[in-house]
């Protein structure tokens, strides 16, 4: 590994996203994998992270030593679980290392903890690191400003059958964009529908969640008017799209002042 490359510590390296990040880093010209952290009870402890990810051996074995991983890194990427967030933030603050948080399902208290931590370190937090999805966010905002007040709006979230949180973090972000842009509140949001329904409230925003098959991630925002329908859709074809965005975010953070950044800042949107 070249010392001129950014050293990236990966937390949660044995999962789907971790494997994708390891694969993309293996061919990166700017960054390299310095360590990959898994839980102390993981069956993957000591295994070569490259071989586990389906590429050639990279000499970076899975470890449970979070402190050492963070200490030796230029930036940390965390795709573990929301239960690990406090440990990640504590280690990053202690060693003054910036961190990309890709973990979804964070509680409101944890989101508040990110704001507090960002006073001391740089943090990129986004429910979706894909460049395309962040364009979806921007296009949704534009459409909401242009026609949202005169539209029935629905969000569709489709993911693989193994995904644990619902709605997805991306769907929640789309909801937040719509609520903020249109001046509405969570009282205007409805999750699915069943039974005998009253006439649709014109300010209502519906969210519909599918968990089936092996779908990586599809999201659509619908704007229905009496005359036309706009559908803004993003479909992930490969998890590498999230990995590329995450690594780009890590490279963005290195040397940057403390603060809480999103992917709009990373992409200059």
Swiss-Prot record:
Q: Which cysteines are joined by disulfide bonds?
A: none
Q: Where is the active site?
A: 159 (proton donor/acceptor), 163 (proton donor)
Q: Provide the primary localization.
A: cytoplasm
Localization annotation: Cytoplasm
Catalytic activity as recorded in UniProt: (S)-2,3,4,5-tetrahydrodipicolinate + NAD(+) + H2O = (2S,4S)-4-hydroxy-2,3,4,5-tetrahydrodipicolinate + NADH + H(+); (S)-2,3,4,5-tetrahydrodipicolinate + NADP(+) + H2O = (2S,4S)-4-hydroxy-2,3,4,5-tetrahydrodipicolinate + NADPH + H(+)
Q: What is its EC number?
A: 1.17.1.8
Which pathway does it serve? Amino-acid biosynthesis; L-lysine biosynthesis via DAP pathway; (S)-tetrahydrodipicolinate from L-aspartate: step 4/4
One Pfam family, short name: DapB_C
InterPro entries for this protein: DapB_C, DapB_N, DapB_N_CS, DHDPR_bac, NAD(P)-bd_dom_sf
The positions annotated for binding NAD(+) are 12-17, 102-104, 126-129
A cellular component term, taken from the record's GO annotations: cytosol
Q: Where does (S)-2,3,4,5-tetrahydrodipicolinate bind?
A: 160, 169-170
The Gene Ontology terms for molecular function here are:
4-hydroxy-tetrahydrodipicolinate reductase; NAD binding; NADP binding; oxidoreductase activity, acting on CH or CH2 groups, NAD or NADP as acceptor
**What are the recorded Gene Ontology BP terms?**
diaminopimelate biosynthetic process; lysine biosynthetic process via diaminopimelate
UniProt entry keywords in alphabetical sequence: Amino-acid biosynthesis, Cytoplasm, Diaminopimelate biosynthesis, Lysine biosynthesis, NAD, NADP, Oxidoreductase
Which family is this sequence assigned to?
A: Belongs to the DapB family.
Q: What does this protein do?
A: Catalyzes the conversion of 4-hydroxy-tetrahydrodipicolinate (HTPA) to tetrahydrodipicolinate.
Q: What is this protein called?
A: 4-hydroxy-tetrahydrodipicolinate reductase
């Amino acid at each position: 590994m070249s010392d001129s490359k950014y050293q990236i510590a990966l937390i949660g390296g044995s999962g789907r996203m971790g494997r994708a990040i390891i694969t993309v880093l293996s061919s990166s010209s700017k960054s390299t994998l310095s360590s990959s952290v898994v839980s102390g009870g993981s069956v993957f402890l000591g295994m070569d992270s490259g071989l586990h990810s389906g590429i050639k051996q990279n000499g970076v074995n899975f470890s449970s030593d979070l402190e050492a991983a963070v200490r030796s890194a230029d930036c940390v990427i965390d795709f573990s679980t929301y239960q690990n967030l406090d440990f990640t933030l504590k280690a990053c603050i202690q060693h003054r290392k910036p961190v990309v948080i890709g973990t979804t399902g964070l509680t409101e208290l944890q989101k508040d903890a990110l704001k507090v931590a960002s006073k001391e370190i740089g943090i990129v937090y986004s429910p979706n690191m894909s460049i395309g999805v962040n364009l979806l966010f921007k296009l949704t905002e534009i459409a909401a400003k242009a026609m949202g007040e005169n539209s029935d709006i629905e969000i569709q979230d489709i993911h693989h059958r193994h995904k644990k949180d619902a709605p997805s973090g991306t769907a929640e972000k789309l909801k937040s964009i719509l609520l903020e842009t249109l001046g509405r509140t969570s009282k205007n949001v409805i999750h699915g529908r069943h039974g005998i329904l009253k006439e649709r409230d014109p300010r209502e925003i519906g969210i519909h969640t599918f968990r089936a098959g092996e779908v990586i991630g599809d999201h659509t925002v619908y704007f229905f008017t009496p005359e036309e329908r706009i559908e803004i859709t993003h479909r992930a074809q490969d998890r590498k799209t999230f990995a590329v965005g995450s690594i780009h975010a890590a490279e963005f953070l290195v040397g940057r002042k403390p603060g809480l950044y999103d992917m709009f800042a990373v992409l200059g949107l």
